[in-house]
């Protein structure tokens, strides 16, 4: 153990010496070697003489080069190869070496240095080709031109290629191309990456302008104000509400000297101090105002919970029914009202830098923290398309290290909302929503507490205005909990006299807990076949309600109930004159009908999984849903349909067209999101009640659904069952008479009643004397199954005979007489 400790201590000491002291001096030593070699080469080239002994010349005279025979040989090789460009080798080595010695940065990128050296060598070759273009002067002592062997070879090769392409002035064009390449390469090698034309123009203009006469220096200011004092002075006295001041500077910042008079500033403008790019970026963000929305105050309570505890007021109706108490629901934990403004600003800066990396320019103008997500409002620069930012949702989530990110346009503002989950997620409880003043004092007829907005505000929707709701979401997204919260919202508001339910639950798990409550018109339907019968009964109930409303001349259920209550309060009734027939003289007979209307309750049909029903009886379900969605609003009948498979075979075009209000919980793909909402975004949700609510008109709002446990639902259902026995209607699931059901089936297919269709088929068979299923199918333009049913009925009633071995039937009925 001691040996291992000594070894680790030795290694740590060696690393400290190596990286803390030795490595900077090693970098300086290498730079010094490069500098010395460059100086030696420069001296050898400066004292070059073509007559000195070298590899190309053998003489008995001593070398006149300052470095002797070695210097003469090296300088001869460089001059013969590159000509005057050989001077560039020595100069580049001096630049590299001096820079290395001056900086001595151990973290310097060696790869960058190697790249600069390689590009510099290529630049010297291009420069030699440029120098080979003009003819050498008379004092030039070498056989090759001013560019040496490599310069002449490169220039003649490129000129030959251009001449082969019949381009005039090939040599001049080649020299120009090599000149451009040499300038770019050598500039990169010495560290010139960008050239600012405006800076060059300003420098030339300042050089050409006459200098202003120096004025006497002003007296020094009494005292210089530090940076913090100047910032405080620059800020307005009363900052805008909801905006945080810029971050304060450090205590030990260097004071800034007092400002000079205007004349002195015109005479000389000092250059700005050089500072790190990251610090400059952060300072610019600090100085920019960034509004942070204040967290919402706790939801304003309606006082219902206090009244229930004091027993000073009970929610009794005329029939003695008592609404459930809020104490049956779980109480929420207190939320923190403080917002970490520094963390939000830091996230906003990081988000801006991430967007800049993907080429999106803009500015975070507003930050809206919420219980589950925080929305950063990006004001994009002119020319930035919204679709481009929306497409970066996955990349933004990856760069910000969050689970998911949703990007959408902020309604009514020139901003793009970027929604990212909070590090700590708050839970929304149904009790908080039902105890809020928005729910208690709302004017909605069928209020549903959908959840809280991004800012933490309760969101109460009215099912009567929707008028139907389509819900989709995968398993575990919070869909079933959301449906339970919607049902409980109505049960906490309306007694059975005002609202009744028909619940269809093919999965036999989600809605069975409500079985036996007084609000139900029938037991919870779990058989898909009985679900079809229940929907057909709902259609008949809708038509019956329309007949009642037409008798007293009202347009909707609200007007009908109002008149019914007024008539009952006054002890009056309605009278209507109807024609009952004709007398012997042919005159119509009228009678007075007395109508005593009774208030009709609203009817809510809840289907938990419509996909199972579509698999069993897709056409019947779609036809019934279509009729109810188109006509049931005025009759006070509303649908809530939910599915965990939002595919096009379940949510058909007919269903989507009649359900303008939809809710999408988390789905698995963008295709499912487009199927339910018409646009993507639902695949970026967080699950556990996180939803997108699309109201009529296509406006989409992100909501966080409330949590309600199975125990809470069971407690409320048990309380309601204790209030009384439900009054079930057997015909809801047993169905009406056969003729009515067949008529409804014919109405769903758009062909009128079943009897009319059968009479038409008999007329076709007796007139044309042809009896086959395919023939009836073609003539009546109906499906094969319906045509086969009509043929079996005609065989049963003796219109046609049984089919023989060839499938032909004998027509037993007499032919139809001609008209």
Swiss-Prot record:
SUPFAM superfamilies in alphabetical order: P-loop containing nucleoside triphosphate hydrolases, Winged helix' DNA-binding domain
Any GO MF annotation of the entry: ATP binding
Single Gene Ontology BP annotation: chromosome segregation
Composition skew (Acidic residues), residue ranges: 275-284
Domain of life: Bacteria
Membrane topology: Multi-pass membrane protein
Region Disordered: start-end pairs: 207-309
Keywords from the named record: ATP-binding, Cell cycle, Cell division, Cell inner membrane, Cell membrane, Chromosome partition, DNA-binding, Membrane, Nucleotide-binding, Transmembrane, Transmembrane helix
CDD domains registered for this protein in UniProt: TrwB_TraG_TraD_VirD4
Transmembrane segments: 31-51, 77-97, 119-139, 145-165, 172-192
Localization of this protein: Cell inner membrane
Entry keyword annotation includes Nucleus: no
Cytoplasmic side stretches: 193-819
Annotated ranges, domain FtsK: 456-674
Residues annotated for ATP binding in this entry: 476-481
Record note on quaternary structure: Homohexamer. Forms a ring that surrounds DNA.
Free-text domain note: Consists of an N-terminal domain, which is sufficient for the localization to the septal ring and is required for cell division, followed by a linker domain, and a C-terminal domain, which forms the translocation motor involved in chromosome segregation. The C-terminal domain can be further subdivided into alpha, beta and gamma subdomains. The alpha and beta subdomains multimerise to produce a hexameric ring, contain the nucleotide binding motif and form the DNA pump.
Family the UniProt entry places it in: Belongs to the FtsK/SpoIIIE/SftA family.
Functional note: Essential cell division protein that coordinates cell division and chromosome segregation. The N-terminus is involved in assembly of the cell-division machinery. The C-terminus functions as a DNA motor that moves dsDNA in an ATP-dependent manner towards the dif recombination site, which is located within the replication terminus region. Translocation stops specifically at Xer-dif sites, where FtsK interacts with the Xer recombinase, allowing activation of chromosome unlinking by recombination. FtsK orienting polar sequences (KOPS) guide the direction of DNA translocation.
Name the record gives this protein: DNA translocase FtsK
Organism: Caulobacter vibrioides (strain ATCC 19089 / CIP 103742 / CB 15) (Caulobacter crescentus)
